[in-house]
A protein has these predicted regions:
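Conserved beta-strand-loop-beta-strand hairpin that lines the nucleotide-binding pocket
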Residues: 2, 6-7, 13-115, 133-138
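N-terminal assembly/transducer modules of large multi-domain enzymes
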Residues: 104-164
Length: 164
């Protein structure tokens, strides 16, 4: 994959396929600590395999597929950019949680891509799913912003333009 927004799309699609009725997306951009964080929590069916299996590129639970490259590629990208990936049960919603960290200034950090459009398109094509977006960091003008999808996407789009 070429940018973080495509990984976010994959995570959101996984949540929807797992039957999530509520998905929390947390994005944190902190220049002081040189860190980007992305968390996706859902109330879907949770992990149907051990986290080690889910991160194996040759394991998938998707019918008709032979590999499950998305999470393993995301983990490799995160580690290459001085961060990591953790996956497990969601402590707040009871489904699954994926948490990704990367150093913002790392030369190997993939571009963030169009995170705002990814969030909006996913939300409008899955109207039966409730999305909560949390934006944190100096890019967003406040310590923490929780907003409806359209408002959060607009704020996110403006901040991504400044990062470009």
């Amino acid at each position: 994959m070429h940018d973080v927004s495509l990984y976010l799309l994959e995570l959101l699609e996984n949540s929807v396929r797992a039957g999530a009725g509520h998905i929390n997306v947390g994005l944190r951009i902190d220049h002081a600590s040189d860190e980007f964080q992305m968390t996706v929590d859902d109330d879907g069916q949770g992990l149907n395999a051990a986290p080690e299996q889910v991160l194996d590129p040759f394991f998938t639970t998707k019918e008709g597929k032979k590999t499950g490259l998305g999470l393993s590629l995301l983990r490799a990208e995160a580690e290459a950019a001085g961060g990591g990936l953790s996956i497990g049960p969601s402590p707040t919603l009871g489904g699954a949680q994926v948490h990704v960290t990367m150093r913002l200034s790392h030369v190997d950090r993939p571009p963030l891509g169009d995170l705002a459009t990814t969030l909006v398109v996913t939300a409008v094509t899955n109207l039966d799913v409730e999305f909560t977006i949390s934006l944190e960091g100096d890019e967003f003008g406040q310590a923490l912003v929780e907003a409806p999808i359209a408002e959060a996407a607009e704020l996110l789009q403006r901040s991504m333009e400044r990062l470009a």
